[in-house]
Amino acid sequence: AAADPQLAHLSSLSGGWMTGLQFFLRRDLRLAPGHLIFADSPWALTGISQPQFWTPDVLKTFGNGTAAGVLSVCISDWTQPGLFVRKPARECTREDMLQAVCAQLQSHVAASGQDRLEDRDLVDWYLSDSVEHRPDGTVVNHEPLLINTAGSWWRRPEACSRIENLFLASDYVRTHTDIATMEGANEAARRAAEARLSESFAT
């Protein structure tokens, strides 16, 4: 912080868990033309069916080629007990987490009258590598998401620091995208790359 005062505010930024799973399905389950919000799910689930935005047949290159659908789901609340597994997500094993998320999804899809999500639809699933289940039973998230609280934009650092050869590229960097998103992180990365190139040409 002494070398670059803007870095002194990093510890005051708030972070939270918003990490998820991907379900690889035997069929393309198109629940909506865009993002999904499971409004009353205790774990505040959101999701999106991916293949509708991809080129045809791209899934044939995944794994053994049997998956025809991909449903990405984010868990936004890791502190509330679930409906079907009566524990918060951050206290669940990987298997508990799979069971709880699938049950919440199936319940919401069935209630909406849409095409049902069945257990037999699941080919495989993936939990973000940033979520670590330790041997003592604790769960750690190594990549918490910036929480965009009021006034936080002014405490966020620029991509180019005052420290030689230190550039920042992440969702917490100050950009024109005043919210933690992949787009904001991408913009920060472009700014960091441009700053690095500018320094290279300057020397």
Predicted regions mapped to residue ranges:
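C-terminal segments that line or cap access tunnels to active or ligand-binding sites in enzymes
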Residues: 1-156, 162-187, 194, 200-201
